[in-house]
């Protein structure tokens, strides 16, 4: 299964600009960010952040609520998880910046320095192939094959296993 690091800068740009990658929440099908991202891409084009700011003296980081906060129900109780959906203008500028030829090459180079023969990194984003319907399903399939199945195989070889999990990282 192909990871995002195997993509060219052009394909990586397209990957990030897909609605399902802009917001990976399980939202109703009628909520699609494609038109928003296409609008922002057309409106901003090659302009810099400074060129599109309304108030040239203030950066987005100086404002509260520049992103869109949603509350997602965590379980059947009264626990909600705050999720920020990135401001589409800032998201576009970030995607455009990281997928320039030089920056994308550097990102891929740095990730190569993290490679270790005894550590498998499963969390790198996966790209859907012919079998998968979405990038998310590609990631789930990869998780199933490289974590769940590999755990079963390794359990035959090792006597003990250390497991950790974050159960509620958004507690109040």
What function would you assign to each model-found segment?
Residues 1-172:
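Conserved two-metal-ion catalytic palm core of "right-hand" nucleic acid polymerases
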């Amino acid at each position: 299964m192909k990871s995002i690091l195997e993509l060219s800068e052009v394909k990586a740009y397209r990957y990030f600009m897909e609605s399902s990658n802009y917001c990976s929440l399980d939202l109703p099908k009628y909520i699609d960010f494609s038109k928003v991202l296409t609008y922002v891409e057309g409106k901003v084009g090659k302009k810099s952040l400074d060129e599109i700011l309304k108030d040239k003296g203030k950066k987005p980081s100086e404002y509260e609520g520049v992103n869109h906060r949603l509350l997602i129900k965590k379980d059947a109780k009264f626990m909600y998880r705050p999720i920020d959906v990135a401001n589409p203008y800032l998201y576009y500028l970030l995607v455009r910046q990281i997928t320039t030829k030089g920056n994308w090459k550097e990102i891929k180079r740095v990730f190569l320095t993290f490679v270790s023969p005894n550590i498998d990194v499963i969390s790198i984003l996966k790209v859907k192939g012919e079998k998968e319907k979405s990038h998310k399903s590609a990631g789930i399939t990869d998780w199933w094959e490289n974590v769940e199945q590999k755990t079963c195989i390794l359990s035959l070889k090792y006597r003990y296993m250390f497991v950790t999990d974050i159960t509620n990282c958004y507690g109040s």
